[in-house]
Amino acid sequence: SGAAAAQTAAASSLHQASNHTFYPWMAIAGESTADPIKSKIRSDLTQYGGISTDMGKRYSESLAGSLLPDWLGTNGLRRRGRQTYTR
């Protein structure tokens, strides 16, 4: 249901992230689609935005299964270790 999905998205942005919560920006990064239109959009994103050189492509492919799209930077959606943001 749409309300439950919106509630899950709101809760996932407030609380700590787990592997099973849905983030709204995960729809951008999805590789599991067989839709040629979406894959064309994704290939345009990887070609024109972010890392587009062969060196960058090899670097992003050498990150073994990082689940991050290669147009995200190194500090894109990562968690830092035990860092306190507010005191």
From Swiss-Prot:
Localization, UniProt = Nucleus
Source domain of life is: Eukaryota
InterPro entries to which the protein is assigned, alphabetical: Homeobox_Antennapedia_CS (IPR001827)
Give GO terms: molecular function aspect only.
DNA binding; DNA-binding transcription factor activity
Q: Which UniProt keywords apply?
A: Activator, Developmental protein, DNA-binding, Homeobox, Nucleus, Transcription, Transcription regulation
Task: State the span of motif (Antp-type hexapeptide).
Answer: 22-27
Query: Which Gene Ontology cellular component terms are annotated?
Result: nucleus
Q: In which tissues is it expressed?
A: In the embryo, expression is seen in the epidermis, somatic and visceral mesoderm, and the peripheral and central nervous system.
Q: What is its main location?
A: nucleus
Physiological role: Sequence-specific transcription factor which is part of a developmental regulatory system that provides cells with specific positional identities on the anterior-posterior axis. Binds the consensus region 5'-TTAAT[GT][GA]-3'. This homeotic protein controls development of the cells in the posterior thoracic and first abdominal segments. It activates the synthesis of the decapentaplegic (DPP) growth factor.
Per the record, the similarity remark reads: Belongs to the Antp homeobox family.
| Name the record gives this protein | Homeotic protein ultrabithorax
What is the species of this protein?
A: Drosophila hydei
- The coding gene here is Ubx
